[in-house]
């Protein structure tokens, strides 16, 4: 049975969805003020695999990734480039969708945009005001975290500990340093009318509102990068409790950072690897192998040496599938069976907190096993199992498949060897080698 590490309880727990076979999963997506870097894509690649595996277990997964298309960073970048905020956001939404397609991340059911839910956010905030969980300052409307008894439970800190790191200096009228903005009063950039004053919603409120609009609570899985644990997910939990007196999610899953040069990969630090640039050098499958070769709760320190290792793994898998498939074809052998031992191991690894890194090791071990046998039935089962596992990882390897002419070339090569026509045999052998068949 599947066990998942729950960030809320800080332990692995058996995964029991609220309404099986339905599973509701919400993952925080990008703020579209620039292209996505490699660190941004790590959660997207991982949760794509999560959905694929849950569907393999015969669950029906409704998977939502939101798009933050109104934000101070968008406004700042739009002003800098002298374009409209929405035009800038649309440009990077298109870039985001193109990247998902290139990386074969096609399992997302819906990508709501924050600007589509402004009216719902206004109603949501008014409810918080009516219930005493929010208050006004000259700068906007804030959430009163002191009214949430267990605020800080995701971060495992109480209010006194959180107070030390909070930023009261941004608004001296805040009742508590950790109170966060629900509706920002501003005239800069795009603003929206409200019953109170023109402004725009706070980021934490955008997600909390969209989740309640799209799902029956609690979510089965709420995911994102580890940097979202606090304050973003903590503040979503607080708002949901205050607004609807419900639990936001049964499981919180957080994907660790992807660093570069031993620092967090960040646009603000300028130490970023843009995915669009990396894809000019590497096949998308290699990027996915890099990401999935480390457990999602362990950080990755990106280097081009790691990329080369992932490329070598990709090449080993490609070479095996090409040669093995050719061997089965020339022997006119085909079956749909899977290797039960391999699949049992695969499920054991995935059901222990989705250990994709060990699954990739399993694939490499399977290829080594295959090199030690010529039994057609076994080789076919190895290949079928590998292809199924690769599909769950969202990796499609376009290995060479022989045509009738290629098969004829093989038999002509065998005849040339048999009749000791070595010159012709060398020519035919080279043709097969060039295509990776032998």
UniProtKB/Swiss-Prot annotation:
Q: Which CDD domains match?
A: CysRS_core (cd00672)
* GO biological process terms held by the UniProt record: cysteinyl-tRNA aminoacylation
Principal localization reads: cytoplasm
Transferase as UniProt keyword: no
GO-annotated cellular components: cytosol
**Motif ('HIGH' region) spans which residues?**
30-40
List the Pfam families: tRNA-synt_1e
Coiled coil residues, start to end: none
Name-wise, this protein is Cysteine--tRNA ligase
